[in-house]
């Protein structure tokens, strides 16, 4: 049993918990969030505008947050070092505030008794892992690791399959990305990113993303070969990667589709899915996969130049991978006697 604490009960924190409840070998024993009280925490978990009402029971009992009869201790500490994870047996912490994303900052959780921290965001210095891509490189001695970003999880899995089969010379990625909590409902100040301060409801907003470059960290042979940008659009959830690549080996689009279909049915099942139906973004709300290859949406200019399209639920699918990463590292840590 993997005993987990969640720091930060925002979009990812809550959806990680929803996913964790579906796994028999994960037990969330505590949640820390200094900005919401216990009653409001229960309300926010029970009702969700995107993923719907939670189908189980949600209660507040004796100072605990109780979901489906499972009690979780609730803390309200601003300083991660002050959270007593050890008192509730939380060996693993999901750091989902979006604030403590470096090794130095996330290490504060270890002072409270946690043994390992999984950052649910890209990190400037912590090792990043993408399920289906580079878990074999995991070192149990690392106490702080990152699950990378939702976009990197989609792009890296797609790029790995294509690169392994045809070779990628170079590529450009655009993610058409749903709104996130850091954006503004109406125009407001955003000193580092002026366009990012514009209202989300009536704009398509160009933005930077490190997702493509991060692929080079999890797939070293692609380092320096991919870059990209983001277009923030006024939808609540589900994003789509548009990857344009130049291939080393010439291939027909039918060959590419077949490779992706086999990947989805075989080694990457549960991480990559394949569709040849006339789908749109809402069809992928609460989808468990990191990457859903859209066979009908891609196009090809020549045997070495192709545009590939892949969908991902940037909330749900990503949170699912956080849980899968927890499962994997717990097993590897146990083997290593950690």
Curated annotation (Swiss-Prot):
GO terms for cellular component: cytosol. It is an enzyme of class 1 (oxidoreductase). Pathway: Carbohydrate degradation; glycolysis; pyruvate from D-glyceraldehyde 3-phosphate: step 1/5. GO terms for biological process: glucose metabolic process; glycolytic process. Its EC number is 1.2.1.12. GO terms for molecular function: glyceraldehyde-3-phosphate dehydrogenase (NAD+) (phosphorylating) activity; NAD binding; NADP binding. D-glyceraldehyde 3-phosphate binds at residues 149-151, 180, 209-210, 232. The record marks 177 as: Activates thiol group during catalysis. This is Glyceraldehyde-3-phosphate dehydrogenase 2. Its main location: cytoplasm. It is found in: Cytoplasm. The active site is at residue 150. NCBIfam families: GAPDH-I. NAD(+) binds at residues 11-12, 33, 78, 314. Homotetramer. Keywords: Cytoplasm, Glycolysis, NAD, Oxidoreductase. Belongs to the glyceraldehyde-3-phosphate dehydrogenase family. SMART domains: Gp_dh_N. It catalyses: D-glyceraldehyde 3-phosphate + phosphate + NAD(+) = (2R)-3-phospho-glyceroyl phosphate + NADH + H(+). PROSITE patterns: GAPDH. It holds the Pfam family Gp_dh_C.
């Amino acid at each position: 049993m993997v005993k987990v604490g969640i720091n930060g009960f925002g979009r990812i924190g809550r959806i990680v918990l929803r996913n964790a409840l579906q796994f028999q070998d994960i037990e969330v024993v505590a949640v820390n969030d200094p900005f919401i009280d216990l009653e409001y925490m229960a309300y926010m978990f029970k009702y969700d505008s995107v993923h719907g009402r939670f189908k189980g029971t949600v209660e507040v009992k004796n100072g605990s947050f109780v979901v489906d009869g499972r009690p979780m201790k609730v803390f309200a500490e601003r300083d991660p070092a002050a959270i007593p994870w050890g008192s509730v047996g939380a060996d693993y912490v999901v750091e989902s505030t979006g604030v403590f994303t470096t090794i130095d900052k996330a290490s504060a959780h270890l002072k409270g008794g946690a043994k390992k921290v999984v950052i649910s965001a890209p990190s400037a210095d912590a090792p990043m892992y993408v399920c289906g891509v580079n878990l074999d490189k995991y070192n149990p001695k690392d106490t702080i690791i990152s699950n990378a970003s939702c976009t990197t999880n989609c792009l890296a899995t797609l790029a790995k399959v294509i690169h392994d089969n045809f070779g990628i010379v170079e590529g450009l990625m655009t993610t058409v990305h749903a709104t996130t909590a850091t954006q503004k409902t109406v125009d407001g100040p955003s000193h580092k990113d002026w366009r990012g301060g514009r209202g989300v409801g009536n704009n398509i907003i160009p933005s930077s993303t490190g997702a493509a470059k991060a692929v080079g960290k999890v797939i070293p042979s692609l380092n320096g070969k991919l870059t990209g940008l983001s277009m923030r659009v006024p939808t609540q959830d589900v994003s789509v990667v548009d990857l344009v690549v130049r291939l080393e080996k010439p291939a027909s689009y039918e060959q590419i589709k077949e490779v992706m279909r086999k990947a989805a049915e075989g080694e990457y099942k549960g991480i990559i899915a394949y569709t040849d139906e006339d789908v749109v973004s809402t069809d992928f709300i609460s989808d468990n996969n990191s990457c859903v290859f859209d066979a009908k949406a891609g196009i090809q200019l020549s045997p070495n130049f192709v545009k590939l399209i892949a969908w991902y639920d940037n909330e749900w699918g990503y949170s699912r991978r956080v849980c899968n990463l927890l499962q994997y590292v717990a097993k590897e840590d146990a083997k290593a006697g950690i």
